[in-house]
């Protein structure tokens, strides 16, 4: 799931016009996917984002607010825990790539990339 559209940002009003208010209540249903047992990882094919900083993505997954807080939350029911947010970028990504036996966590003998 793309971390660049799961919190309020300039493109969201245009998306809301296209999909409507009911669908926006479930916008980017990260929590729903995790709760259903889906292996969720962060990623994007959108190369025009101002920053690929994972800490911004982790913060906004947990708060569903713009970076630094404040304003209205986007699909507040889709907030996840800090541990779940870390997992998207670490162990879940390693599982998705089939490298969980050697990456995805900070442990002796693991590759850190």
Regions found by a protein language model. Name each.
Residues 2-113:
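His/Asp/Glu-enriched, well-ordered alpha-helical/loop segment
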């Amino acid at each position: 799931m793309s971390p660049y559209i799961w919190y309020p940002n300039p493109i969201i009003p245009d998306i809301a016009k296209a999909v409507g208010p009911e669908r926006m209540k479930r916008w980017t249903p990260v929590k729903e996917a995790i709760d259903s047992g889906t292996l969720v990882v962060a990623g994007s094919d959108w190369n025009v984002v101002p920053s690929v900083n994972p800490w911004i993505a982790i913060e906004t997954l947990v708060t569903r607010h713009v970076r630094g807080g404040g304003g209205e939350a986007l699909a507040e029911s889709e907030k996840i825990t800090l541990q779940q947010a870390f997992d998207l970028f670490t162990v879940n990504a390693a599982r998705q790539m089939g490298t969980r036996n050697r990456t995805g966590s900070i442990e002796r003998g693991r590759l850190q990339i």
